[in-house]
Amino acid sequence: MQYHVDGELVAREDATVHVEDRGFRYGDAAFETCRAYGGEVFAWDRHLRRLENTCETLEMPEAVPADLALRVAETLDANDLADAYVRVSVTRGVQPGKLTPREEVDPTVVVQVKPLPRGGTDGEPVWDGHATVQTVKTRRVPSAAVPADAKTHNYLNGIMARLELRRVANEGYQPDEALLRDVDGNLQEGTTSNVFFVDDGTLYTPATGELLPGITRELVLELAADESFPVETGRYDVDDLRDADEAFLTNTTWELRPIETVDGLQVGTGPITALLQRLYRERVEARCYK
């Protein structure tokens, strides 16, 4: 396996960053997780825009290289991968060990890939079953503290939530995802996913502001609008999710993953989830395999 590090393809075992890199030292970096289907990165323009927006939030607006798409393509080609997970990281680079960053930025740019199954209408899911989700005590860091719409390397909030999952897990109960609430107790998101639920034919999802608006979330809302589904975004309690007719998680790798249980209570899939899954796969097929 080869990765792209600062403009050069290197073997995975030789892919390193400097110990004084601020991405390593402080999590001072932006990243995007993308998915390639048939050799093409799906929704690349949206991922690139969010990466650039995160870098602007971090006050390093020129950090994303103009040839980033080429670096991604070279990494896929070097590994002979058409269907793949793609992670792009842009750090503030190597700087002295002071919390306040320098204004001048010499970014470290890394592209990592790994194989995934084919997607689209003839594909298969990367997950091995419907999701078991668990509400955790860890709360979503308020956007006033760390901007929710910035996708940065600092994932300690999600890590603490996943550690809670590990503590509650046992031989018969292995949750796949932790659900985070805000400080007021409102449902927000999973640690690496957005959440949707269906009740009486209406599709619901928490409003942006205190969560990371996922690219797959955005696409699902567009697909629902195209089908004239009633859609509402707002503030919801975990009980709204537990009592739903259908529920699912979204992220770039999972696409749409139905939720089987919430805190041990059965929820499951249904016709709206199934239709949105099909429409999403059809869009992938049309954009990337034809």
Task: Annotate each PLM feature.
Residues 1-63, 100-290:
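Helix-start/capping segments and mature chain N-termini
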Residues 66-122:
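Active-site pocket-lining segments that scaffold enzyme catalytic pockets across diverse folds
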